[in-house]
Amino acid sequence: MRIFFDTCILYPRILRNIFLDIASQNFFFPFWSDHIINEWKYVYERKHKDKISELNIEILLLNARWPNSHISINKDHLDKIFLPDINDRHVLSGAISCNANILLTENLKDFPVGTLNRLGISPRSPESLLLQLYSENPELIKRSILNTFDKENKIFGQNFDIKNVFKSYNLKRLTNLIL
C-alpha cells in the first residue's frame, strides 16, 4: 500500500508516530509533500511559537528516516481537481503524484469518495485504517501502538493515557481493542 498523509496525520505527534511505526514494519509506505510539511509548521507554530526550532529538527529527522516519502507534487493536477474546498486540491494532487492507494485524513468530507475512487484512491480515516490493519494482524498493530506510547512516555517523562489520547484522535473503537 502507498498512503499519502494529510497534515492532520503528521500533526499530532503520537498519531504520526503510530502510523510510522506500523509503516516501518512494511505494512505500507507513507508519503507527504512540501505543502503538507508547510501546513504542519503553520499549525504547530500557532500553538507552540516558542518551540518551532524543535519542530524543524523533528522534520529533518522525519525526512532523514523516510527520504523517499517527502515528494514534490505535480502541479499539473491542480487545475483538473475539483473538491468541495479548493484549498485541499494540493492534498489530492500529492496522493496522485505518488500513486497512492489511500489518502489518509481526518477530513473525509473534503474528499468525496466518488472523486477519489475514479482516481484509484481510497479516502480513509485514521481509525478505519488502523481497524483494518488490526483485523489483519492484531498483535503486531497492538505492539506498535503500545511501543509508540512507551517511547513518547520516555521522551516526555510522563504517562500519556491511551484512552484519552485515542478519544482526542477519534479512535474510540480502536481503544476497546487495544486496552
What are these regions (language model features)?
Residues 88-122:
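Acidic, metal-binding active-site segment of PIN/NYN-like and related structure-specific nucleases
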Residues 34-74, 148-166, 170-173:
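PIN-domain endoribonuclease scaffold, especially VapC-family toxins
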Residues 1-17:
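Metal-dependent nucleic-acid phosphoesterase active-site entry motif
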Residues 108-179:
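Acidic, PIN/NYN-like endoribonuclease modules and their adjacent C-terminal/linker elements
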Residues 29, 70, 120-122:
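Conserved beta-strand segments of alpha/beta enzyme cores
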Residues 13-47:
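PIN/NYN-family metal-dependent endoribonuclease catalytic core
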Residues 9-10, 79-87, 109-112:
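Acidic, metal-coordinating catalytic cores used for nucleic-acid/nucleotide bond scission
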